[in-house]
Amino acid sequence: MEQSEDGDLDAGDELFEEVDGDGKGEIFANRELLNIDHVPDENRIVGRDEHITELANEIGPAVTGSPPNSVILYGKTGSGKSLVANHVMERARREAQRRDRRLATVTVDCAQSRGEADTVQTIADKINRSTSGVTVPTRGISTNEYYNRLWQILGTEYDAALITLDEVDRLSDDDILMILSRAREAGKVDVPIGIISISNKVNFREQMTERVKSSLGHNEMIFDPYDGEQLRQILENRKDAFQEDILMPGVIPKTAALAAQRHGDARKAIRLLRHAGDYAKTNNIGTVKESHLELAQEQAEVERLKELISGLPPHSKYVLYALANLTDGTTNSNDWFRTTVIYDVYEEVCKTEATDTLTTDTIRGLLNELAFLEITESNQEHGGMGKGTYKEHRLLWDPNVVFKMNPGSAQVDTDR
């Protein structure tokens, strides 16, 4: 390698000596194993063999170009729904390729692509090939045109398609479910399409219109939370993310126990273990200990909350900051607050963010969405004779976790 004027490039830059591009270092051997989106090999998946087989049976016809069934996967966060869907989809793609069939497989995070046009654009863009002759711009065309381009891509490039809509309950409109599932029947495209809908809400089907229910059929799978032993095994199967002898013996059992307290959330367990490793690395500690889990827990919660609200508009976050300020500032056991009280503090948050406020009705809608995501809880209250009804809201997260998402600008003075 050539030497620059600043010295020998082979020596590297000490500013970046702690950065391990391959996830390796003194603590980690393969940090990728602790990424939430990582899909492990089949022998690392715990307690979901029956789900894998059942889902494969439902969508299996797609590998031959025949019509697959659409399926709805229900379960709490971290119960393995996305993991199983991605695992089975990838195996289906490989099997179709082996059989010389062109199978489109695509996953859309509906928390990020919430509108119908955004979702269709994302699907079309992800499965598009250079040979299709079709372009899929991010904006500038109608929703109908996005559908037309999707049909063109499917018709020229594929024999079948499997579309996973993760967090499908976050979609602003469920029309897309009916349009996709009935596309072949309606003569839009001569390609069978199967939809895997993933929801954290067990009552999601009840929220669908009758037309959508009819289109999707009745194929449903329930994912129960992992128990403590399953969580321990999940972590054991990923402990080679660390260098040998880095994890102290009690770390994995304690991580599993902490995650089991929150409805068996495997995502939380994996996050906790990763953050504990990051803490040890950042502080130049040679091992990961049980005590590091307590320090890592809040950071894992911050990351989870960021994930939950990532697709929400900015003012949803301002409303959340307002409720966190009220909760943090309360001097009694009453942590329920009326919409009007939250709105007053929301106005203060908007001042710190140098932005205009939205209407009270709009804020009511944003509060309803936060409750839907189980970030807050809402109750309808009666004011008494002649005073009508009103809503009160309560934060379900530690206010400090909310503040740490946006240090410095999230806290305001709630004294009046």
From Swiss-Prot:
Keywords: ATP-binding, DNA replication, Nucleotide-binding. Disulfide bonds: none annotated. The keyword Lipid metabolism does not apply. ATP binds at residues 79-83, 226, 238. GO terms for molecular function: ATP binding. One of its GO terms (biological process) is DNA replication. SMART domains: Cdc6_C. It comes from the Archaea. The keyword ATP-binding applies. It holds the Pfam family Cdc6_C. Belongs to the CDC6/cdc18 family. Involved in regulation of DNA replication. This is ORC1-type DNA replication protein 9. It comes from Haloarcula marismortui (strain ATCC 43049 / DSM 3752 / JCM 8966 / VKM B-1809).
